UniProtKB/Swiss-Prot annotation:
It is an enzyme of class 6 (ligase). It comes from the Bacteria. Pfam families: Abhydrolase_1. Pathway: Porphyrin-containing compound metabolism; bacteriochlorophyll biosynthesis (light-independent). Signal peptide: none annotated. Belongs to the lipase/esterase LIP3/BchO family. One of its GO terms (biological process) is photosynthesis. Residues 37-269 form the AB hydrolase-1 domain. It comes from Rhodobacter capsulatus (Rhodopseudomonas capsulata). Keywords: ATP-binding, Bacteriochlorophyll biosynthesis, Chlorophyll biosynthesis, Ligase, Nucleotide-binding, Photosynthesis. It catalyses: protoporphyrin IX + Mg(2+) + ATP + H2O = Mg-protoporphyrin IX + ADP + phosphate + 3 H(+). This is Magnesium-chelatase 30 kDa subunit. InterPro entries: AB_hydrolase_1, AB_hydrolase_fold, AB_hydrolase_sf, BchO. PANTHER family: HYDROLASE, PUTATIVE (AFU_ORTHOLOGUE AFUA_2G14860)-RELATED, MONOACYLGLYCEROL LIPASE.
Amino acid sequence: MDPRALPANWPYRSAAARRRVGPIDWWVIDTGPADGPVLLLLHGLGASGHSFRKMIPGLSARYRVIVPDLPGHGCSRSTARNRFGLKPMAEDLWKLCQHLNVTPAAVIGHSAGGAIALQLALDTPVPRVVGINAALDHFEGVAGVVFPMMARGLAALPFTAPLVTRFGASRQRIGQLLDMTGSVIDAAGKAYYTALIQTPEHVDGGLRMMAQWELGPLIGALPRIAKPVFLIAGNGDRAVPAHVSADAARFLPMATLRRIDGGHLIHEVAADGLSGMILDWLEG
């Protein structure tokens, strides 16, 4: 999406800017005290930095908060079509941090962003991670083979994203899909997602991420992440069941697990975006 096409009420539009690093033209929210400790926030598949709109105010009072749209999502664009997988995306995010001359005090990731946060903790000096309904599980059974194959096939077809945008992106349909996650977000939140999914480039980025996603090496490496990790799991999450975080916590040497009421988009429903809970853990 061209930033000039963003709705006037797009969250933190005025605090975001382009950052070109290698093949990626990032769109990055950068807010809070410039000399404060840095928090890097990573959204999930199909979302954008807007999804942290309720969390950012609570965090940015004390921290410099950096929120990029992931490659191919929102307003971030990449010409490297083979770098949408977990490890390449983590590598490119670290290059963005180096470009900004920051080392995050913690990385906070939602869903697939939680997996990327853990990959960063494994590969870089990132000292702490918060995962919100972190997507740390494979598709089960036959779906584990069929779904990635479908995504690879669809991502290779030039007409797939426009078709999804044209026939599957009505406000009503998107609202229904969001409700199926176990979270009912407000009308403004649904409108933001509608704007994204009505953009073929955003849909294409999501398909490429699905096609190139491989969790196996990270799952096997969880015992090597000897850093504090705070996993927040929504008991009503229908996209990534709470047991996924519970299972991962057993393999992380310094994990804290907290199960709370709510669905997959719990940080978009909670009045403070879960910032209070996260600050308590970061500063406790």
